[in-house]
């Protein structure tokens, strides 16, 4: 079986309201460095933690129109040329962003595996993270849809849990 390339799709369309006063609508948390040991931002770390994965290609980035120059500059700083920066005129959440990224990959003449990533996640165990991705690619190369995440420690309505009253 031919192994497909992996194109990371990095979603960085957050509004910057959850980490106020550090982040703002004009400069959401994904564009901040929250690590005292590194000047890299959450967005930059999202891509850099993937380096070394077999079949990795440069990313497709999705962001708010207002953040396009921030995104481009942050990738210039890490010497990475995105395949595309897709601008959202209005945030419509995850599913439409993923659909547009898939269409962009097709328009680039590719049939890759898309690795959908949020730009604002903190992932400490990068070695284990890469192992999980490599394992997932085995199934995805067989035509399966693969999702992964963490076991939640509590219910949070901001992540889709329904609060009964």
Model-derived regions, located:
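Short glycine- and Lys/Arg-enriched binding-loop motifs that mark or flank ligand-binding interfaces
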Residues: 9-12, 154-156
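Short acidic donor-binding/metal-coordinating loop in glycosyltransferase active sites
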Residues: 119
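Basic, gly/Ser/Thr/Pro-rich low-complexity segments located predominantly at protein N termini
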Residues: 18-21, 163-165
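Conserved N-terminal catalytic core of the sugar/cofactor nucleotidyltransferase
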Residues: 1-10, 19-25, 33-116, 124-127
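Conserved core of the sugar-phosphate nucleotidyltransferase
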Residues: 126-165
């Amino acid at each position: 079986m031919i192994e497909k390339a992996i194109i990371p799709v990095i979603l960085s369309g957050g509004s910057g309201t959850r980490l106020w006063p550090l982040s703002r609508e004009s400069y959401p948390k994904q564009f901040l460095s929250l690590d005292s040991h590194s000047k890299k931002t959450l967005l930059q770390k999202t891509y850099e933690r993937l380096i070394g994965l077999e079949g990795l290609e440069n990313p497709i980035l999705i962001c708010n129109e207002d953040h396009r120059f921030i995104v481009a500059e942050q990738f210039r700083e890490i010497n990475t040329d995105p395949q595309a920066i897709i601008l959202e005129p209005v945030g419509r959440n995850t599913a439409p962003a993923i659909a547009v990224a898939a269409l962009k990959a097709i328009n680039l003449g590719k049939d890759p595996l898309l690795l959908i990533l949020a730009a604002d996640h903190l992932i400490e165990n990068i070695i284990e993270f890469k192992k999980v991705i490599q394992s997932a690619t085995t199934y995805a190369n067989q035509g399966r849809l693969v999702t992964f995440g963490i076991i939640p420690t509590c219910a949070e309505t901001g992540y889709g849990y329904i609060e009964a009253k």
